[in-house]
Structures are given as structure tokens and as C-alpha cells.
Amino acid sequence: MSIELDLQLAVENEHGLPSEAEFALWLTRTITPFQAQAEVTVRIVDEAESHALNLNYRGKDKPTNVLSFPFEAPSGMEMDLLGDLVICRQVVEREAIEQNKPLQAHWAHMVVHGSLHLLGYDHIEDDEAEEMESLETEIMQEMGFTDPYLAEKE
């Protein structure tokens, strides 16, 4: 089993960000139950880049916490490239405070959530959302974090 991480830090200050080892662990714990080999780029960005990407790809005129860009290999070509995650530092930090969550747990949740999107999971329909949230909760708890949706369930 091997998950290859390409970590890109496109922020002014790297202080307080999770380590490359933490990002790699979160990816590995999320992806390897579904596929043994994968390459994922995780790009940490500021609000301006997140906003521009969110507007361009989703038509939403604001920054967002995580964007997932699954890689689609040309027909007949086998590659381990799963895709890219773009995570906005300021949004993650702000949401952790607003949702009263430990910052490290929220970073981990964004990696888990985004990775599941790369694997084909979605939350557009209620049944899909329930399945995806259940998986996220299970993975987070296996890594020692609390249920990321606990506040919404109370």
C-alpha cells in the first residue's frame, strides 16, 4: 500500500499548518481501504485562490474549505493519480473556531472529506450524504478524532 503525497504550500506563512507527515497519514487512512496505490496533490491556498477556483469550477462567488479535482485518465491509460485537493487555510481556521472544533481535527476532516470526493463519493442526494458522512465519521474516529458532525446531530 502506498499513497504518494505532493504537498504544495501556496500561503505566505506556513506556521501552524499540519505537517507533511500528518497530511500523508490522513490521506493513507482514508484512501487505502479503497485502493492500495494512489498519488494525491494537496495544495494549501489563501482565500483569493480558493475564491477564484470556487467561482471558476463551481460558480460560487466565495472561498470554500476544500475543493476536490478527481483525475480522469484517458481511455486505456492506467495511472495511480487520484487527483488534487485544494484546501483554504483561512476558511479551515475560521470554521474550526465557528464550529468549536480543534483545528487539527478540522484539517483532518477536510482531507478525509476531500479524499472521499476523489474516490467518487458525493453528498448531493440525502442518501449519498448520509453514506459519505457515515464514512467520514468512521475514518475520523479510527484516527482518534471525534465525529465531525456531532454538533449537527445534537
From Swiss-Prot:
Cofactor info, note text: Binds 1 zinc ion.
Gene Ontology biological-process entries: rRNA processing
InterPro entries with a match to the protein in the record: MetalPrtase_cat_dom_sf_prd, YbeY, YbeY_CS
Broadest EC class assigned to this enzyme: hydrolase
Protein source organism: Vibrio cholerae serotype O1 (strain ATCC 39315 / El Tor Inaba N16961)
NCBIfam families: rRNA maturation RNase YbeY
E.C. number(s) listed in UniProt: 3.1.-.-
Biological role: Single strand-specific metallo-endoribonuclease involved in late-stage 70S ribosome quality control and in maturation of the 3' terminus of the 16S rRNA.
Entry's localization field: Cytoplasm
Name under which the protein is recorded: Endoribonuclease YbeY
GN (gene name): ybeY
Family stated for the protein in its record: Belongs to the endoribonuclease YbeY family.
Disulfide bond keyword on record: no
Record-linked Pfam families: YbeY
Organism lineage string: Bacteria, Pseudomonadati, Pseudomonadota, Gammaproteobacteria, Vibrionales
Binding of Zn(2+), residues: 113, 117, 123
Subcellular location, principal: cytoplasm
Cofactor field: Zn(2+)
Gene3D superfamilies: Metalloproteases ('zincins'), catalytic domain
GO CC annotations, alphabetized: cytoplasm
